[in-house]
């Protein structure tokens, strides 16, 4: 059976370490008529290795075999991101040796890359950063696609951290300094702007979410939260709740079974007058994390 040939593409990027004068001359001699846009810059890696970093947007599709004839020692990959993104990347050390044409605006390969990112379950904010021009033009369609095909539902226990103490001791700051992307949940039903961040922060909480909703958020099973016009999967790994009051005061014990809330709390810290410490068992009206 004949070997499968790699698919051709118009947009390629390459890295060529320890380039020779002859190889540099080949890059400088590329013919303008073959490209929509091309750029190549000189760089030095973290270990001081000199290399050429290039991006070529051909007018006709090219296979890897043809590119290897051009620069045999180079590492070639199909390009991601927009032409503008690659222009910035290849010129970041301000030593450009080749520029042909102008970056192509919003090419279809960028759109295909953004769609693939949605299908892979990437956060919309990350897609917007990587494919900024595409997002400006097709953002609504990408969001609709994400809502239609859905994020992978949660299949793990969301960690719940509670931080209590008086005003001005640094509860909000402690929450904000935790590692990971963050979404600040405001009072109200809607989660507009939620993009599956690592951490959801509920600042100055005093029971303004329905008890049954809070239990579902703190659990391990699939759950959707409402955005205007639809629902999105809740997949955050951690919920951080700051409050001036203890959890037993958040909900009415006559109407809500508070042990169900407490057992979903993984960690509870309080201000002891000097620092934040784990709450001693004697202060817990119900056991946590069981």
Swiss-Prot record:
GO BP annotations, alphabetical order: DNA replication
Annotated binding of a divalent metal cation, by residue: 43, 51, 93
Boundaries of every CRESS-DNA virus Rep endonuclease domain copy: 6-103
Motif RCR-1 boundaries: 13-16
Binding site for ATP: 165-172
Subcellular location: Host nucleus
Cofactor remark: Divalent metal cations, possibly Mg(2+) or Mn(2+).
Motif stretch (Nuclear localization signal): 4-13, 60-80
Active site (catalytic residues): 89 (for dna cleavage activity)
GO cellular component: host cell nucleus
EC number: 2.7.7.-, 3.1.21.-, 3.6.1.-
Motif interval(s): RCR-3: 89-92
Cofactor(s) required for function per UniProt: Mg(2+); Mn(2+)
GO molecular function per UniProt: ATP binding; ATP hydrolysis activity; DNA binding; endonuclease activity; metal ion binding; nucleotidyltransferase activity; RNA binding; RNA helicase activity
Motif (RCR-2): 51-53
Family: Belongs to the nanoviruses/circoviruses replication-associated protein family.
Described purpose of this protein according to its UniProt entry: Essential for the replication of viral ssDNA. The closed circular ssDNA genome is first converted to a superhelical dsDNA. Rep and/or Rep' binds a specific hairpin at the genome origin of replication. Introduces an endonucleolytic nick within the conserved sequence 5'-AGTATTAC-3' in the intergenic region of the genome, thereby initiating the rolling circle replication (RCR). Following cleavage, binds covalently to the 5'-phosphate of DNA as a tyrosyl ester. The cleavage gives rise to a free 3'-OH that serves as a primer for the cellular DNA polymerase.
Free-text note regarding domains: There are 3 rolling circle replication (RCR) motifs. RCR-2 is probably involved in metal coordination. RCR-3 is required for phosphodiester bond cleavage for initiation of RCR.
Subunit structure comment from the entry: Interacts with the capsid protein; this interaction relocates Rep into the nucleus.
Full protein name: Replication-associated protein
Taxonomic source organism: Canary circovirus
């Amino acid at each position: 059976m004949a070997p499968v040939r790699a698919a051709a593409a118009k947009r390629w990027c390459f890295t060529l370490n320890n380039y020779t004068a002859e190889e540099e001359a080949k890059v400088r001699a590329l013919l303008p008529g073959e490209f929509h846009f091309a750029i190549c810059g000189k760089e030095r890696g973290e270990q001081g290795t000199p290399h050429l970093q290039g991006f070529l947007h051909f007018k006709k599709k090219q296979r890897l075999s043809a590119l290897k004839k051009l620069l045999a020692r180079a590492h070639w990959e199909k390009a991601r991101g927009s032409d503008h993104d690659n222009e910035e990347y290849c010129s970041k050390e301000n030593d450009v040796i080749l520029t042909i044409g102008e970056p192509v605006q919003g090419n279809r390969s960028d759109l295909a890359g953004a769609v693939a990112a949605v299908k892979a379950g990437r956060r919309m904010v990350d897609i917007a950063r990587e494919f900024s021009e595409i997002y400006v033009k097709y953002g609504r369609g990408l969001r609709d696609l994400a809502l239609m095909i859905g994020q992978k539902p949660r299949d793990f226990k969301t960690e719940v951290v509670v931080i209590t103490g008086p005003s001005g001791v640094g509860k909000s700051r402690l929450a904000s300094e935790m590692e990971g992307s963050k979404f600040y949940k405001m009072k109200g039903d809607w989660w507009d702007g939620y993009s599956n961040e690592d951490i959801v922060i509920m600042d100055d909480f005093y029971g303004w979410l329905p008890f049954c909703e809070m239990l579902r958020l703190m659990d391990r099973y699939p759950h959707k939260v409402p955005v205007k016009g639809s629902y999105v999967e809740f997949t955050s790994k951690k919920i951080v709740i700051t409050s001036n009051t203890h959890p037993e005061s958040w909900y009415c014990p006559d109407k809500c079974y508070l042990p169900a809330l407490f057992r979903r709390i993984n960690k509870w810290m309080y201000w002891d007058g000097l620092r934040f410490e784990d709450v001693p068992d004697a202060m817990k009206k119900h056991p946590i994390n069981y």
